[in-house]
Amino acid sequence: MPAALFPSRQPGAQPPHSAAQTARPSTGRVARLGRRTAAGLAVTVTLAAALPSPAHLASHTAPAGPEVTTFTGGAFNGVSAVSAADAWAVGSISPPQGRNFRTLVAHWDGTRWARVPSPSPGEPDVATLAGVSAVSAADAWAVGFYGTAGLRTLVLHWDGTRWARVPSPNPGAPVSSTALAGVSAVSASSAWAVGAYGNTEKTLVLRWNGTRWAQVPSPSPGGAQGTQLLGVTSLPQGGAWAVGCSGSSSQRTLALQWTGTRWTQAPTPSPGFSACLNAVTAVSASDVWAVGWAARRHNGPAQTLLLHWDGTRWTRVASPSPRLASTELTGVSATSAADAWAVGGVVRHQVSKTFVLHWDGTCWARVASPSQGSSVLNGVSGVSSSDALAAGSGGTGSLALRWTGSRWVIS
């Protein structure tokens, strides 16, 4: 998930996602887009290359019962819940015929997931949705990218009746690519979307003012080399945070704060040889969580990384990370100061399984979570202490989990 819009993984390290072989382009510097683009397949996208050819599409209800739905050939990259009976999950899926991935949007009504039609640029373009944010039953945003030789931003909006494409800036066009990885909306007139653009990768921040999307200047530290934003969260009071990483051979964590007038970089711990932040969530201006991974050495296994903002500074908080395994956190969601979830994947012996942590106000602890074949979770959205949804991929298709208040079950 998260593979990442511009895959956020330490070069050469064993990635903590699916055991399926990762496709790596043979030319060009790899840009990091860590969201998974096909079931069980983590694809590293070069800004100058298209995704690999997909398998055929099928959707079915799994044998476990009518409440368990998977979309074969697809993967969820993000999830956002308005209530226990109203949530969206987005990603990409391979069509029954055709060479490239199309957008995947599914709706949760409290009982089952159902696919909803979503715009997707035609062949030969690939199209994937990397993030989603729902404000109400009639207001939700999904963002990602499309293209072949050059990527372009893709923004969709839900008005309560249908998903429609909305124009969005592409500062890299026509000479370089532009893509979006995350979105956060707080009202019909306020939303942020983040990603990266340019052949050397610069941070990209777009703002919705109720009428149109416009680019807002944002810092690109490290000479813009390998710089990318992968997650964003906004506060009702007007503040916002965006996270990601910068650097190529050795990545450093990156956090940008919206002060109300401009984006500024805040110092963040960046342990080990390489580290990156994939997602961020805020309870208040003085209670913010960011998650990702850190590797102690070049080509070494990844470990979980959890940072907390207390209103003054970012500090690293201890988090479980299995020994003799590679583990990454790709999504995070907090409903209160004593209730937060972080999700991702753990790879051991070339097999990937879902990985879930919970914050109870005192410490992060691992919580058992089901997998479906080789699995990974790319996003999570909490509604209350007794209700949450997580989404990703497992086996040959999409995977969605639901927290019942006592355990995680496949939904």
Located regions from the model:
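N-terminal low-complexity Pro/Gly-rich stretches
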Residues: M1-P25
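Secretory targeting and sorting signals
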Residues: P2-L5, S26-A58
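Basic polycationic patches enriched in arginine
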Residues: R9, R24, R29-R36, R162, ...
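Generic alpha-helix initiation/capping and coil-helix boundary signal
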Residues: P16, A31-V43, S133, V183-S184, ...
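Residue-level hotspots at or immediately adjacent to binding/recognition sites across diverse folds
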Residues: A55-S411
